[in-house]
Amino acid sequence: MEFNLVTIGFTIVNFIILMLILKHFFFDKVNKVIDDRNNEVALTIKKADAQNEEARLLKVESEKNLEDSKLQGKTIVENYKVKAEKVSEEITAEAKTEAQNILERAKRETQREKEKAEDEIKNQVVELAVLISSKALENSINEAEHRKLIEDFVSKVGI
């Protein structure tokens, strides 16, 4: 194995020339492509991080809005529940009042009917007593005296 310095020198020169040519035509362009790609990846990562942060903030805001909505819904339901109970109590009170009024009217009507029936019975008793006594006495007392006697009798009896 012999080392030829001239061959080694030409090989080194060829290698340097090749490197310069490659650097001039390829390495700068390849490095530029790699740098551009690195920048693009870094930018994409920044955008993704920004979007993740935005999504996190939106999620927090949405959760807060959801909690607020739940609280509002609960408040609305409670308000309507209170209103419904109040309306129910008012309706119940009105119904009780109406029922009481109906009962009072029925009692008054019953009392009137009772008094009317008592008056009617009293009149019939008086007429019947007059008829019976007139037949029994056969004209011994006049009718006015007879009626007075019967009315006294009826008032004492309590009819």
UniProtKB/Swiss-Prot annotation:
Transmembrane found in the keyword field: yes
Keyword terms: ATP synthesis, Cell membrane, CF(0), Hydrogen ion transport, Ion transport, Membrane, Transmembrane, Transmembrane helix, Transport
Superkingdom in the source lineage: Bacteria
Transmembrane domains' residue ranges: 2-22
GO cellular component, one term: plasma membrane
Entries under InterPro entries matching the protein: ATP_synth_B-like_membr_sf, ATP_synth_b/b'su_bac/chlpt, ATP_synth_F0_bsu_bac, ATP_synthase_B_chain
Membrane topology: Single-pass membrane protein
Compartment list: Cell membrane
Principal subcellular localization: membrane
Subunit structure of this chain's protein: F-type ATPases have 2 components, F(1) - the catalytic core - and F(0) - the membrane proton channel. F(1) has five subunits: alpha(3), beta(3), gamma(1), delta(1), epsilon(1). F(0) has three main subunits: a(1), b(2) and c(10-14). The alpha and beta chains form an alternating ring which encloses part of the gamma chain. F(1) is attached to F(0) by a central stalk formed by the gamma and epsilon chains, while a peripheral stalk is formed by the delta and b chains.
Family to which the UniProt record says this protein belongs: Belongs to the ATPase B chain family.
The protein, known as: ATP synthase subunit b
Gene giving rise to this polypeptide: atpF
